[in-house]
Amino acid sequence: MSDSYFLYHSIGMYPNKARDLAGALAEFAFVWGRPDDGQWAYALGTRQRFIDRWRAILNAPSQSVTTFESVTGAFHALLASLPPGHLRGRSVLVGADCFPSNHFLLQGMAAKYGFTLKTVPLRQGAAHVEDEDFLDHWTPQVGLALLTWISSTTSHRIDLGSMWRMGGAWAALSARISPKGRG
């Protein structure tokens, strides 16, 4: 993996980022190192402001957005929270361009949860799965569709509205993942 991919994939870059980051870390160190009990209120308040900013960007309802250490950890928590048997005998649909660790997770959990993993292939020479190809594979047998809203590797953005409508038509559970800071 090249350094440019790592930087592009993992973190946003902008002018004066180092200065802004140094200031934020200095403020955190000052608060966290004070000899009082205000550290957790500060840290949790900062976290909530971060969540509220993302919620506003996403135009999401109050208390509907949270943070997680990783996309894969969040997706695992979602899978583990499903009612027992929800996926048994059904399919989980993912694109070949989904976050690789989520694909590995699903491969490993298929037997335990009793589902078949269906991976929508890339077209010859394509860097991302086309929306219509994903929709063509979405049948009533799909119990969960993992939608990658914005790909971390190609920046391709799916037509989320079309995907939601399909999920509603089949009464399937859809998980929207956006590993570029939105997931």
Task: Please identify what each model-predicted range represents.
Residues 1-183:
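Pyridoxal 5′-phosphate
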